[in-house]
Amino acid sequence: MRHLIFTGFVLTLTALEAVNVAKSTDNDIVLKVSTEKHSSRDSHHFSGEWLESPWGDLYQFRAGDQNWLTAREHCLSLNADLAAIRNVEQLDWILSHYAPLSSRFAQRLVQIGLYAPEGQTHEWKWLNGNEINKTLLWSSGEPYDHSMEGRERCGLLNVEKRVLDDVDCESTSPDHHAQRYICQRTSENHKQQQRSNNYIWQKIENLFSFFGIGGSPTPHNATIPNDYEDEVLKNETSATVKSTVKFSDSEEETSSEEEESVSKTLAALPKIEGSGESTALKELQEPEGSGQIVEKKAIETTGDLVSGVDEEKLDKMINKMEEMIKSIDDLTVPPAVLERTTVSTVVLKKEEIVKQEKTDEKKVEDKKETLANELNDNKISESIEGDFDQAQSKDMPKADIEPPKEEDCDEEGSGSGSGEEDEKDESSEKIELAPEKEDKIKEFLGVLRLFLDRAEHGDLRKLLDDQSGKTLLERMKNAVREANRREFEMLEKLENSKKSEEEKEELAKKDQMSTEEQKDLYKKISSAVMKAAKIHKIEEADKVQDEQAMEKFNIAKVKADSEEAESEGTVEVLKSAKEGKAEIKEKVGNDDYYGDYLDDNNVIKIQNREKKDAKEESSSDDKKSTDEKKKEIKKIEKTNKVNHDEPKKEEKKNEEQVKETKLESSTTVAKKEDVTTVASTTEEPKSDKDSEGSGSDIEESTVSSAKPAEAEENEAELEASGHEEVSTTTESTTVAVKEVPVDEIEKIAKLEAKQHTEDEKVTVETKQETAVTPAPTTSEKTSTTAAPSTKPAEETTTTTEAPSTTTKPVTVAVKKVSPEEMEKLVKKESTEKVTLLPPLPTFTFPTLAPFTFPTLPTLATTKPSPAPKVPTLEEILGNLNDQFKKLLSPPKPLPK
């Protein structure tokens, strides 16, 4: 029960000082209560509690719109200074109060107690005089004074980078954001500040001194045996005086006047017997948070204790204490803000005062009688001292006494107002929260908003099912971090997918050919196609030419087989056929009709050329149809003419044989002198050549026969149709003639006379038939007559026409050739002549018997065999172009 008495006693004194009830007669008593509440401070200023560090110093973390000098002045007003950081451990402890740290946050700077003394620009020190530890780093390029007047002499701490920076001491934030700063106070200064500013702790000390717990003895009136219960009864009688409160308009009183008024009020109060001197009520300063526990003082010695305790009296005291506690709870409701309160007492009537005094005296007398049997004051003090002994009170329940908070200190002593005004104030009163609570509420709402924005469907269920013992705020923060992590993972996946797509696109671009490469490839392919087409065309032309040449070769072979020996005429025919083939090859090879397909605008040219070719084909088809009809008509006419001319030709042959017999008789005389035989075959289409003569008077006679009218018509038609002529030429052969003695000539003549009963002239006629080809050819028949005569005028040539053959005039030149010239000509021919057939056997005319070629039967004209249909070059190129376009066209995009 003793601890309950002590607790009630402390609460009673606290309530009395808070209410400040005074008793006065006539004068008004004025009591000024501090109105500088935390809510009335600057809206940009945030304060905190004093936090004790592991090394004993106390720190307060603040924020406001101020520069470095203003921050230091504020710390000095609190009996502190800006924080100094001595090592990395202190830095870590300070930065732990600015968690969380992240490079994603905006830059946070803290004003600390670092400065450069006047005149020293490179030696920075802390405000307590210590030098900077080398383990603390500066930001890059700092410290460096960027101002022209040397104003950057104060230090800052970068929270995120953990480095130091310099700043102008008088500069503030341009965007008026809250500037952070830290105040540092030693433990000794903190205790001193708490004693001077916290009046509650001063009253507690007075309370301890009242009970004799203190260093200096307090005067004690031992003659009056009144205990604490009597004093309480006296206070109750004085508290029954009704009091009213009125507001005063005077706001110009100084602190000295207020102290005088307070001292008068306290003097008017009834003094407690046995207590120490009353302490004056000071003007309340700005609350400084929680204080330190005051040291326990020695207990003063008192008189002897009285044995025995009245339990009924203790029960009454406990009941009264409970009632007082209830009244104190009613008074702790925060009243409206009042700058000044005036307490006035109303003087009661004298009768009532007299009655009260009588009742008081009776009570006092009764108590004096009962107190003789109660404990002595010394025993009571010893019992109280035992209560404070920790060893004795170890097992007893304890009541913790906590100092009031800043809000309670500011609001205490405000008093109560009058009836009507109190009701208005209570209706208009609003609950004000401490800045720490506001920050927590804001933080909670911000985290809740982030959680609702970023959380998924299952996050709320996880949050409710979480039984880890963490607070709701921490669980929501963890959920937000998890959502952020998911978003970062999704962003990384998207970035990786984009990178992979870009790489695929780059590879596709690299694989695709550029337009220039496509053009080059198209040119190469088209050139290869053109070459292949030309080779194909040449091969087709070679096949046709080979067929024509084989026909000519077969005809010549048949003639050679029918004869006993080969003649120069057959060789020339075969040679002319081969030369005609070579000329056709050259013409076909030089055809560069499709050379312009390699241009850039090849597609347009191909289309235009196809249109022209279609027109030409239509016109050529019409011409071919008309040409074929004309050819059929001409063939019919030729067959009719041949049948009509055959009897005439036979008559002419008979006449020619008669003439030849006459000529042979005249040649026998000439053989005795000279024997010359020259056979020359030359092809001259429309002109006569002069014969060559070296030292001889032999003349050459030429007989030209014009082409038939039918051949001229055929040539004109073929030229109009645009076909090329394929002409065959025969080279002339010269035979050297030797001078033979007369005796040998006679012998030869005798031998010939024996062999031939009838002298005949040796004639050699070569017939050349025209083969039916796409281009018109001129068939020539060369005849060589060996006419040894004494006179050049007697030289003659005979021509015979066979059906479907044409003969050309052949000039025979007779001259004397020396053996040396003949040898030279033979060597020259051997070097220049190209052998198209196996080498022919050499022979000499004198050793051969004269012979005549039999008349060859007329051969039917062979119809041209239709060549197989070959695709044109335009068709081949068109198909190839279509295929190349498909190959060179860009690939279709893949379906996404």
Curated annotation (Swiss-Prot):
Basic and acidic residues: compositionally biased ranges: 354-382, 395-406, 427-436, 575-590, 607-663, 683-692, 740-768
Region (Disordered): 243-264, 354-436, 492-519, 557-809
Biased composition (Low complexity): 727-739, 773-809
Keyword Glycoprotein annotated: yes
Source organism, top-level taxon: Eukaryota
Keyword Disulfide bond among record annotations: yes
CDD domains hit by this protein: CLECT (cd00037)
Keywords attached to this entry: Disulfide bond, Glycoprotein, Lectin, Secreted, Signal
Molecular function per GO: carbohydrate binding
Coarse class of the protein's main subcellular location: secreted
Matches recorded under Pfam families: Lectin_C
GO cellular component: extracellular region
Glycan attachment positions: 133, 221, 235
Record's subcellular location: Secreted
Residue ranges, compositional bias (Acidic residues): 250-260, 407-426
Signal peptide coordinates: 1-18
Disulphide connectivity of cysteines: 154-169
All copies of domain C-type lectin, residue ranges: 54-178
Designated name of the protein: C-type lectin domain-containing protein 180
Species of provenance: Caenorhabditis elegans
Gene: clec-180
